[in-house]
Amino acid sequence: MQISNLRHYPTFADTIADRGWHAWWTESGVPIENYRAHVHLMLEKDGIPAALVAHDDDRYIGSVLIIENDLDERPDYAPWIAALWVDPDFRRQGIAAQLITRSRAHIAQLGHDTCYLCATADKRPYYLKQGFTLLEEDVAGLDVFSISSG
């Protein structure tokens, strides 16, 4: 398995969009085409936004997005680790942790000291175990975390 910037493996863009939209956006009213366009923007330049993809050659395993803002209620926090996804067959193998580590490194290379993440409260134990600090609870129904990028 390797973790690559989506810019180097653009064939995974639609898969990343599909997984993310089905996991978090189906009930939002946002069309999948809009979410797909958001992911395709990550192919255009280095920096933020970006996507990292875990894969075994041409087999998708998981992905994570690095974006400017993942929570409208907290516009001052940036950048964010978002849409962390590992396909069910590959879970509990440390892949999500590796995607987080690579995201943090990418964010650090861009000169940011801290990154943020939001998740439902049931995910809190996982993110605390990964070294995140809980900043706030129940912001639009989500926990808000931070972690050093370095």
Which functions belong to the PLM regions below?
Residues 87, 120:
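Residue-level recognition of the GNAT/N-acetyltransferase active site
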Residues 1-16:
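A short beta-loop-alpha structural element at the N-terminal edge
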Residues 116-118, 128, 133-148:
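Conserved catalytic-core motifs of GNAT/GCN5-like acyltransferases
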Residues 24-52, 61, 65:
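Active-site rim helix/loop that mediates acceptor-substrate recognition in acyltransferases
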Residues 51-53, 59-69, 80, 85:
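Conserved beta-strand in the GNAT
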Residues 107-119:
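Conserved GNAT acetyl-CoA-binding A-motif
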Residues 90, 94-102:
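Conserved acetyl-CoA pyrophosphate-binding loop and the N-cap/start of the following alpha-helix
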